[in-house]
């Protein structure tokens, strides 16, 4: 059974330097990573540059900064840094009129107990949500979580419509994941707002094109569309074009005329 068209749901990640042009050409959305590198939040030229890059693209996601920013950090000063950077990112997203943001959950195996991760994350995100307008959506993304349970627990305990989850399918298929990608979808479905699409061979995080790896990508997309019909998607490749052609061949998007 063919997937319904993803035309109104699909975005291209800014990790492809051609993403804005491709989004316009293919009439898709864009997930900007302009501020994923936190120091750019302090660069006064970054905001006008990003505003120009996204001009004319109607469907947008904002990927928040993540390196060394850990909401569940043991040191409260480290948590304070994460809060400060995330608030800067929130301000930048609002300045760009972007209402949807992705943030990494921040779990690190063998450093944090899962129970600590959940407990501290619930506190952190409740505090952060004080500053988030009612019409914005935050989606917490899996990176090194071994299973969906911790993120699901965080979202369920916070129980706020502004906070949902982002399933990164490629991360769910690396050596740190103990759960096959297909088995993440249903548990996350009640909170699933967004999905990152990229492939690999089940070990390292390659961010390979959708048709190059052992993830059952067609089945993943169909299952998400059924279990979480409001969820959107982003292709996360350094070169998104092969994935766009793969999706077009599947009947999931339309080739540009």
Residue locations for each model-derived region?
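Conserved, mostly hydrophobic/aromatic
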Residues: 30, 63, 82, 93, ...
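N-terminal pre-domain/capping segments
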Residues: 1-88, 257
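Alpha-helix-loop-beta-strand connector modules within alpha/beta enzyme cores
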Residues: 50-67, 121-135, 217-224, 229
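Active-site acidic/histidine proton-transfer and metal-coordination neighborhood
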Residues: 72-164
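Histidine-acidic metal/acid-base catalytic patches
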Residues: 1-8, 18-23, 88, 99, ...
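Acidic-and-aromatic substrate-binding clefts and catalytic sites of carbohydrate-active enzymes
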Residues: 13-21, 34-48, 70-73, 109-113, ...
